[in-house]
């Protein structure tokens, strides 16, 4: 379709509208991105969890990593089954629900591109949605990763069975509220910054440039999200590692307890391995997600 030009001038072509991809594209691309990220970054997740569960002064990240490699070897991948099982649906839900909420917000507000506040809002809503899916898997993963539980559980299914016998079905949802805080903060920070960072970067002229920009934007946004959500993640790990009633219950009171008893810095235990995982991990997520989205768009 073309618009009429002035006399003697050729008509100006009307740009074709950008076709929105179906929701299942976001589900597939997000799932593949999530599994890719967890396979590469999982050892740092184990170190992060062990540091968060330490009360008082503990090992540094490098000491923890060296000790884990020396003593555990491939057993450092203990607990990877729950995140692998949940990673595809979790990341699929992260990207698909963010896109869904973004469309709803844009439709309600009447604009075509999200403002930063709208991007934060859709990210927070996506994080809340994601939290309900991941919490049982997170609980099993935390208990398998905890150093003090090394001889307690023989496998993922053994942990599931013992948790169910001791705490019932509701036991798998321990830490739901702190998980909501963790995911809402990270997703709000991540999706809220991506568009801003991309617009600040030089416009790419090649496919390689697009990949580099996506990695930079995802990495910086992932780092910011990690800075926001680490206190909630610390108390979530402690809440979920407790069998039965314990010292830590709700997110905000538990954050205040940790800060009072161990100092403010304790709320950022495990931050270095976490940010080393989720900073580059955020870049991997965005690069793989957008790459798969393009592949799927090409097939249609």
Curated annotation (Swiss-Prot):
Coiled coil: none
Region span, Disordered: 1-20
Its membrane topology: Multi-pass membrane protein
InterPro entries reported in the protein's UniProt record: Mit_carrier, Mito_2-oxodicarb_carrier, Mitochondrial_sb/sol_carrier, Mt_carrier_dom_sf
Transport listed as a keyword: yes
PANTHER family: MITOCHONDRIAL 2-OXODICARBOXYLATE CARRIER
Protein name as catalogued: Probable mitochondrial 2-oxodicarboxylate carrier
Taxonomic source organism: Dictyostelium discoideum
Gene that encodes it: mcfT
